[in-house]
Amino acid sequence: MSSTMQATEIRLDGRRVLVTGAARGLGEAFARALVAAGARVVISDVLHERGEALARELGTAAHYVPMDLADGASITAGVEAAAAALGGLDGLINNGAITNSGGKTMQQLDAATWDRVMDVNVRGTWLTTVAAQPHLAASGSGRVVNLASDTALWGAPRLMAYIASKGAVIAMTRGMARELGPQGITVNAIAPGLTLVEATAYVPEERHQYYLRARDE
C-alpha cells in the first residue's frame, strides 16, 4: 500500500471573488489560481494597464476594475462595480498594500509616509470589507482573506510603518471575524514571509537573508 498522499484539488466553480492589488505580485498569483480553480474574478488595482492586460489574458472569467485603496469613494465605487460585473460577491481577498518605508529607521520615517501606509493598508482594508459586506452576506457563505505579514509577528526592523499596519490587519481580522461571523461571513488572515515578487525586487539580498535568520531567533 502506497504511503504517498495526493493533495486534494480545490475547486471554486462559480465562486465570485474580488482581489485587491491584483495587477502584479501575490495578487496576480491569487487571481490566476482562482480562475484556474473555476472561480470568476475581479482584479482591482491602480496599475490600470497591467490590470486590464491580466484580465484579458485570463479571459471571460476575469474583469478589471480600478480601485485606489487610499480613496474611500474609489473603494466604494470599485466594490459596487465588481459586484455588478460578477452578479454578486462570494469572496474578498484584501491583498492590496504598500510598503514605502523599507530600509528606514523609525527615526528616519516621516509622518506623511506613515499616514500613507496606514491609509492604504489599514483604512483601505477596513473600507473595502465594509463595502463588500452586504454582497458577502447575501452570498450566504461569504469569505474574506486579509493579507498580513510575518514581519508583524517577529518585528522586522527598518520597516516600522509596514509592520505596524500589518499588525493592525491581524487585529482587525479577529474583530471582523466576530462581527461578520453571525452574518455567515468567514474572515481569516494569512501572514506570508518576504516573497520574491516585483514589488520586493528592490530589497537587497542580504536583507532577504537577514529576514530568514532573524524571524527564527
Positions of predicted regions on the chain:
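Alpha-helical segment proximal to the catalytic Tyr-Lys
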Residues: P134, R178-P182
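Active-site loop-to-helix junction immediately N-terminal to the catalytic Tyr of the SDR YXXXK motif
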Residues: G155-I163, G175, V203
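Active-site helix of classical SDR
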Residues: T129, S165, T173
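Canonical Rossmann dinucleotide-binding motif of NAD(H)/NADP(H)-dependent dehydrogenases/reductases
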Residues: E9-V42
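The beta1-alpha1 cofactor-binding region of Rossmann-like NAD(H)/NADP(H)-dependent oxidoreductases
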Residues: H48-E49, M67-V79, A111
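Residue(s) in the substrate-gating loop at a strand-loop-helix junction
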Residues: S149
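Substrate-binding pocket helix/loop in short-chain dehydrogenase/reductase
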Residues: G103-M106, D110-D115, T200, Y211
